[in-house]
Curated annotation (Swiss-Prot):
Sequence positions that bind a divalent metal cation 1: 219, 230, 430
GO CC terms in record: cytoplasm
Predominant subcellular localization, coarse grouping: cytoplasm
Sequence similarity: Belongs to the peptidase M24A family. Methionine aminopeptidase eukaryotic type 2 subfamily.
Role of this protein: Cotranslationally removes the N-terminal methionine from nascent proteins. The N-terminal methionine is often cleaved when the second residue in the primary sequence is small and uncharged (Met-Ala-, Cys, Gly, Pro, Ser, Thr, or Val).
Protein name: Methionine aminopeptidase 2-2
Biased composition (Basic residues): 61-75
Biased composition (Polar residues): 15-28
EC number: 3.4.11.18
Residues noted as binding substrate in the record, renumbered to the chain: 199, 307
Note on how the cofactor is bound: Binds 2 divalent metal cations per subunit. Has a high-affinity and a low affinity metal-binding site. The true nature of the physiological cofactor is under debate. The enzyme is active with cobalt, zinc, manganese or divalent iron ions. Most likely, methionine aminopeptidases function as mononuclear Fe(2+)-metalloproteases under physiological conditions, and the catalytically relevant metal-binding site has been assigned to the histidine-containing high-affinity site.
InterPro entries: Creatinase/aminopeptidase-like, Met_Aminopeptidase_Type2, Pept_M24, Pept_M24_MAP, Pept_M24A_MAP2, Pept_M24A_MAP2_BS, WH-like_DNA-bd_sf, WH_DNA-bd_sf
Amino acid sequence: MAAQAAPELAKLDLNKNTGSAEASTVPASGSDKDDAENEGDSDDDRDDEQTGGSAEVNAEKKKKKKRPKKKKKTAKVQSVPPRIPLTTLFPNNSFPEGEIVEYLNENSYRTTNEEKRHLDRMNNDFLAEYRQAAEIHRQVRQYAQKELIKPGATLTDIAEGIEDGVRHLTGHLGLEEGDSLVAGMGFPTGLNINHCAAHYSPNAGNKVVLQHGDVMKVDFGVHVNGRIVDSAFTVAFDPVFDPLLTAVKEATNTGIKEAGIDVRMSDIGAAIQETMESYELELNGTSYPIKAIRNLNGHTIGQYEIHGGVNGKSVPIVKGGDQTKMEEGETYAIETFGSTGKGYVRDDMETSHYAKVPSAPSVPLRLTSAKNLYSLINKNFGTLPFCRRYLDRLGQEKYLLGLNNLVSSGLVDAYPPLCDVKGSYTAQFEHTILLRPNVKEVISRGDDY
């Protein structure tokens, strides 16, 4: 889930041609034995037999020379809507790699250093899982951009269309106990409109319809064996918002460019802010400076832990004093948020996102509904974020009392939507990057952004 709020905000309330080869090996119909039995016939008969035999032999030779037609290799393409598991399209598990970026300056030796290359080769399973998740994200978002995200579409239809695609492409629909932990949604689909920047997903009964004048952030995650690809983009139908989208996209690319082993977080944040705040948006004759949302950050990603767990790190998008360095082997979500408002978000609107607290202490639960729900969360989501619709999908009813009890007991965190002032517009772009020993890989990079 894409956005990690700054610490002070976190303290606020609260997915035959068959037979051709066999035909060429069928035994001949004529034989030497037949020719011997017919040897005593008349000359005319013998001539006829010889002629017939010769015809059969010639026919047989033609049969033997005739090779079966080779099947034309047709490129396997994804269906619309996406329903073909990715392992069917890539049967050898050779999934496309992301954008490969060589390290620069003092880290340039890593690209050719044999020891670093050896360490990188040891990560084959890790890379295959991440690349599979990334390709699923690319294929599903391509479908969403072309077929789902249109003025007049409901947020529920968009969210469920994305999530159904992810689940089918992973091959894990998540309806059986534990299936969602093998592969599926890395976190719920965020569909954040206008002043809302993050963590909004439609709950059951939501009737919100996307409008032509809306600016919507689409943020969803895909995981394979807990390797979460976290990537987001912004859609606006009115070109008047292009400067806002360009500013945030360029700021994210700046963050990706600056990121690397031994780079200080403060340097990345300063570069991001400088890029983003060089833009402005003119709306109805008024110019609005585009501000980086200072209390939202990028973050490390851990296995099954979207914000990196207890030792997770934050990547600021404004200049500051954080001297923490990035390290070899880490995975980061580099995301930036821009706003025409105050550049600061607060909790607002109805909560949809939740996640089990990693390594939560043992707490006695008095409510039976809370106990049962906590068991279901452990078995189906673990520490992966989930939303109310996911509980509905598993057949849960009247669970809000138990869910709120888990939140108040400190076993589950609630993530309310994060919003700037009403009337403002916000945008987001995000990629997942891997700091491999010898290169940096922008694992979620695609042709779209």
